[in-house]
Amino acid sequence: MQKQENLTKNQKIILDIIEKSSQPLKAYSILYDVKKKGINAPLQVYRALNKLVKIGKIHKIESRNAFIACKNSKCQIAKATVFSICESCEDVTEIHDHKLSEHLRDFKDNKGMKYNKYNLEFFGLCKKCV
């Protein structure tokens, strides 16, 4: 995984904003926050987001078209993510489960499928909202 000091200025700025957020952020919300720091074009934001996803610093929540920081310093999963999402407060938790990972790997092997990536999102109510 790429270290933060190897990131571009734009990537560092955007990563910092995402890491400080308690909720997933959409690209245009990020753009609004970074305009005062000299990042004015949506393309600049999307390039930085794509690179940060690729190197595993952030994850994309596909159903929300939003981004969160990877909280697991040992995360090696840039192409395979699993999240639980609260439908009430929209809290997102990244799930790290070795048994689930093994099951998905076995499923892939049994089906003879080569996945480029997968993103699983489980929806329900968190402990606070039940």
Language-model segments: which ranges?
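Short amphipathic alpha-helical elements of helix-turn-helix/winged-helix folds
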Residues: 13-21, 33, 55
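Short, hydrophobic-biased segments on the C-terminal half of alpha helices
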Residues: 46-50
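Short, basic interhelical loop/turn and adjoining N-cap
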Residues: 36-40
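Key DNA-contact positions within bacterial/archaeal DNA-binding proteins
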Residues: 43
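Non-DNA-binding regulatory cores of transcription-related proteins
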Residues: 60, 64, 69-130
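A short, conserved structural fragment
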Residues: 53-61
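Short acidic, hydrophobic short linear motifs in intrinsically disordered regions
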Residues: 24-34
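Short alpha-helical segments that sit at the start of domains
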Residues: 1-16
